[in-house]
C-alpha cells in the first residue's frame, strides 16, 4: 500500500464521507441537499418533503437486471463485471472519446475479448472526468460512497484502490445479490425476458424459498419484429416452448397467449414493447392473416414489417384485456445506428439514437378499439421530449387506458426528470403518471436512481408550495404517491 492510501478495512465500514488529505486525491462528498433548488426557502421545503420519502421501499417495475443473480445468489465478479460491463451509458461515452469497447471487455459476436479487468478499470478511472455533469456520475458517486463506503473520488490515482476495495467487498456475504436486494429495501423488482426464455431463473427464485420479490416482464419483440436479425430462430424456440404451430396466424396468437400465461404464473404483471415507432393498426382478421403469411414467408417490404409490428401492438392490447397485463410501449429509438459496431458487437452497445416520434396518429387505431376499455392499461414512454406537452399529456389526460411513463433513457437525468414534470403536469396532472422506473441493467445504481427521482420530484413540489399552488401537506402526500403508491397501482403490483 502506498503512503496516504486507505486500507480496505478503513474504506468499507464507515459510510460517512471524510476529508482525505493526500494531495493526489480528492474527497468524495455527497452533499445532503444535492439536486434540491438553489433558493434557500424552496430548498428548505424540498428537504422537508424528501424526509417523507427518503426511506420508502423501492418499487422497480421495469428494468433489465439478470434474474440469475437472484436465483443462484453467486458472488459478483469484480468492479468491471458489476459496474462497467452492464452499463451502456458508460461505454457509449467512452467510445465517443476513442476508447475501444474491446479495451473495456465488452463482448463481441465472437465472445468476450481478451482483456485485463484491472486495466479496463484504470482506463475508466482515467476518463471519469468525461462524466462530469451527467447522471452517470451522480449515480455512480452515490454507489461509491453509500454502497462501498469509498471516501475519495474515482480518478487515475485511485483506480487501483477502488478496484481492490470493490473486489474485496464483493467477496463478502453482504454483497451477494440477495443481500444487496434486501439492503436496498427493494419491495419488488421486474426483469425483462422474451417469450423464448425458459424462465428457469424465475422458477429457481420461486423454488428457493427466498422472500425477495423478483418478477419478469413479457417482451415479445424478437418474435414480433420480422426485421430483427434473430426473428426466424426465435420463432423456432417460440414453437418449442409454446407447443403451437407458430407459422399459422391462429397458432402464433395462441402461442403468445400461452407464454403470457406462463409468465403470469411466475408473477408477471406487465408486457413491454420496444418498437421503432408507436404505430398501431386494426386490420380485419383476413387482412392480418394475409400479412402474416407474407411475414412467415420472408416476402415482405419494410412497410409491411412496420404494419405487422403495428398490428401486433393491437393484438397485444387485446390479450391484455383478457389477462390483465399492463402494456408498456417504448418507441422512438433508432437502434444500432453504428452499423460497423453492430456487425462486430451486436445490439445494446450504446449506439441507439432518439428520433422524432408521433403518438396522436400512431396510437389512434389501438385507441379507437380499446381506448375506453376498463381492463386495459397502456403506459407510454418517449425519447422525443417535444411530444410531452403537445401529444402525450393531452392523450393521457383524456383516455382512461393511457398513463405516462417517466422520463426515459436519455432523459432520466436531473434536468430530464424536471422537464418531464414541467411539461406534463399542467395537462395530465401527477396521477396520470406512474412514478419512476429505473429501467437499468446496473443493479447497484437502482437506489441512487430512485433517490435522484425522489429529490427532483420533491424539488418540483417544493416550488409549487412556495408559489402557494399546493399546501405542504398536499405536496407531502403527492411525493409519497409518486415514490411508492403510483408505481404499485399502475403496474398492478
How would you describe each model-predicted region?
Residues 356-362:
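Divalent-cation-assisted or electrostatically stabilized phosphate/pyrophosphate-binding catalytic cores
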Residues 342-353:
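Active-site loop ensemble at the mouth of alpha/beta enzyme cores that anchors a bound cofactor
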Amino acid at each position: 500500500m502506498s503512503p496516504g492510501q486507505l486500507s480496505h478495512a478503513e474504506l468499507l465500514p464507515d459510510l460517512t464521507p471524510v476529508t482525505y488529505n493526500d494531495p493526489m486525491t480528492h474527497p468524495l462528498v455527497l452533499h445532503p441537499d444535492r439536486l434540491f433548488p438553489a433558493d434557500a426557502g424552496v430548498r428548505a421545503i424540498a428537504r422537508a418533503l424528501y424526509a417523507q420519502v427518503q426511506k420508502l421501499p423501492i418499487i422497480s417495475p421495469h428494468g433489465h437486471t439478470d434474474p440469475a443473480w437472484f436465483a443462484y445468489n453467486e458472488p459478483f465478479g469484480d468492479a468491471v463485471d458489476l459496474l462497467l460491463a452492464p452499463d451502456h451509458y458508460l461505454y457509449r461515452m467512452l467510445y465517443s472519446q476513442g476508447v475501444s469497447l474491446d479495451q473495456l471487455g465488452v463482448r463481441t459476436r465472437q465472445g468476450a475479448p481478451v482483456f485485463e479487468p484491472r486495466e479496463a478499470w484504470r482506463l475508466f478511472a482515467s476518463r471519469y472526468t468525461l462524466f462530469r455533469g451527467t447522471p452517470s456520475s451522480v449515480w455512480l458517486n452515490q454507489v461509491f460512497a453509500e454502497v462501498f463506503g469509498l471516501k475519495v473520488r474515482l480518478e487515475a490515482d485511485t483506480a487501483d484502490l477502488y478496484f481492490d476495495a470493490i473486489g474485496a467487498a464483493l467477496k463478502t456475504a453482504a454483497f451477494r445479490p440477495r443481500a444487496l436486494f434486501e439492503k436496498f429495501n427493494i419491495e419488488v423488482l421486474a426483469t425483462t425476458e422474451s417469450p423464448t426464455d425458459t424462465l428457469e431463473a424465475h422458477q429457481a427464485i420461486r423454488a428457493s424459498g427466498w422472500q425477495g420479490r423478483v418478477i419478469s416482464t413479457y417482451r415479445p419483440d424478437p418474435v414480433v419484429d420480422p426485421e430483427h436479425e434473430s426473428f426466424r430462430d426465435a420463432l423456432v424456440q417460440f414453437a418449442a416452448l409454446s407447443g403451437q404451430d407458430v407459422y399459422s396466424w391462429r397458432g402464433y396468437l395462441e402461442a403468445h397467449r400461452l407464454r403470457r400465461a406462463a409468465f403470469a404464473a411466475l408473477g408477471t404483471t406487465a408486457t413491454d414493447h420496444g418498437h421503432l415507432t408507436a404505430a398501431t393498426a386494426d386490420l380485419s382478421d383476413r387482412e392480418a392473416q394475409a400479412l402474416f403469411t407474407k411475414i412467415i414467408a420472408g416476402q415482405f417490404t419494410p412497410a409491411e414489417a412496420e404494419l405487422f409490428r403495428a398490428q401486433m401492438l393491437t393484438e397485444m392490447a387485446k390479450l391484455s384485456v383478457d389477462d390483465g397485463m399492463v402494456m408498456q410501449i417504448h418507441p422512438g429509438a433508432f437502434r444500432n445506428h453504428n452499423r460497423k459496431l453492430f456487425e462486430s458487437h451486436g445490439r445494446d452497445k450504446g449506439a441507439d439514437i432518439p428520433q422524432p416520434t408521433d403518438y396522436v396518429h400512431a396510437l389512434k387505431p389501438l385507441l379507437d378499439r380499446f381506448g375506453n376499455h376498463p381492463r386495459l392499461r397502456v403506459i407510454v414512454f418517449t425519447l422525443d421530449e417535444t411530444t410531452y406537452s403537445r401529444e402525450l399529456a393531452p392523450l393521457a389526460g383524456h383516455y382512461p387506458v393511457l398513463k405516462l411513463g417517466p422520463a426515459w433513457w436519455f432523459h432520466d437525468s436531473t434536468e430530464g426528470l424536471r422537464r418531464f414534470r414541467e411539461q406534463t403536469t399542467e395537462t395530465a396532472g401527477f396521477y396520470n403518471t406512474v412514478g419512476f422506473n429505473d429501467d437499468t441493467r446496473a443493479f447497484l445504481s437502482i437506489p441512487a436512481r430512485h433517490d435522484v427521482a425522489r429529490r427532483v420530484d420533491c424539488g418540483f413540489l417544493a416550488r409549487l408550495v412556495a408559489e402557494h399552488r399546493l399546501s405542504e401537506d398536499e405536496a407531502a402526500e403527492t411525493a409519497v404517491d409518486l415514490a411508492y403508491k403510483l408505481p404499485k397501482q399502475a403496474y398492478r403490483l
